[in-house]
Amino acid sequence: MDSLDAFATGKLDALEAGSLRRKLVPTERGSGAAAARRGRALVSFSCNDYLGLSHHPRVIAAAQAAAASHGAGAGGSRLVTGDHPYLGALEDGLARHKGAEAALVFGSGYLANLGITPALAGRGDLVLLDELSHACMWAGARLSGAQVMTFRHNDPGDLAARLAEHRPHHGRALVLTERVFSMDGDRAPLGDILGIAESYDAWTLVDDAHGIGVVEDGPRAPLEMGTLSKALGSYGGYLCASRPVVDLMTSRARSFVYTTGLPPASAAAALEALAILEAEPERRARPLALARRFTARLGLPEAESAVVPVLVGEAQAALDISAALEAAGFLVVAIRPPTVPAGTARLRVAFSAAHDEAQVDALAEAVAALTGRA
């Protein structure tokens, strides 16, 4: 057997050969859309801070006050001593915002999805998820022990066909999808999906990580999870559902039970960001408007969310364009397999209320020149 280092080196060499090796790049984020890498000042179009709230003075002040009064960390699982008052207040706010009976805060969006599905499904059950669902939805589905199947991306007809064929042979059934897909920026036909799931006696879990605060119109699912780290500018995850479901998660979602509670500063920051989000509808409308300005200038399909993919194809080509954009003063990270399917490496452009029109137009001009769309 190879030594541990030899094994790791071999794997790294293979990744390097395919332009798929990941490396950390220290990045300093400033207010607005400002960023810095390798000593170069940049305008960032790769951050998920869709409403620019992570640097909002009120959000920062709320975090500072919470840390000063309740400490830097929760100190334990929420079921032991880590259930500080900010968590309950945040859960009340999230439930109200989503029109749900209750909410539960997790340590991250990944941890939420890792815990929700296994608490609801197991052996003998069926989990159907959109083929482009986020990795954490896949992880939770596989961890559940249920039979896991996919349906074609945003295809209600294929979902119905799979449920018709497989639902009779299973106990419980869950359908998993996203309101806004993180790498393509398109939106699920939730009305159709929810109707089909209900007709086959299946529960629907929607990941709203990239929708909350930006595009939230449309029907609500019985299970809606999301993150506090994007439009809300903080860190953490949550589930909004009925009170019995939330109470079940409190006892059975292992990624909740066996994890230290979210730090007071993170919870307080998210709570303050939620208040700003609800009070400033013009802030919420801006990311989508800027995304559509960008797609119009490049002749791309009209943006459906704050996320716009510019497909390139091969991983190295995407890396090269990203590097050229950085040299021109823009931070637009290349997204490569396995995050996206092979042959679909892309620039993932994320728009924020902190951007201005001149920055968007300048990026569109640079991307057009580098991708042959000029």
Curated annotation (Swiss-Prot):
Its EC number is 2.3.1.47. Pyridoxal 5'-phosphate binds at G109, Y110, S182, D207, D208, A209, H210, T227, L228, S229, K230. GO terms for molecular function: 8-amino-7-oxononanoate synthase activity; pyridoxal phosphate binding. GO terms for biological process: biotin biosynthetic process. Pathway: Cofactor biosynthesis; biotin biosynthesis. It catalyses: 6-carboxyhexanoyl-[ACP] + L-alanine + H(+) = (8S)-8-amino-7-oxononanoate + holo-[ACP] + CO2. Substrate binds at R22, R29, H134, T339. The modification N6-(pyridoxal phosphate)lysine is found at K230. It is an enzyme of class 2 (transferase). Catalyzes the decarboxylative condensation of pimeloyl-[acyl-carrier protein] and L-alanine to produce 8-amino-7-oxononanoate (AON), [acyl-carrier protein], and carbon dioxide. Homodimer. This is 8-amino-7-oxononanoate synthase. It comes from Methylobacterium radiotolerans (strain ATCC 27329 / DSM 1819 / JCM 2831 / NBRC 15690 / NCIMB 10815 / 0-1).
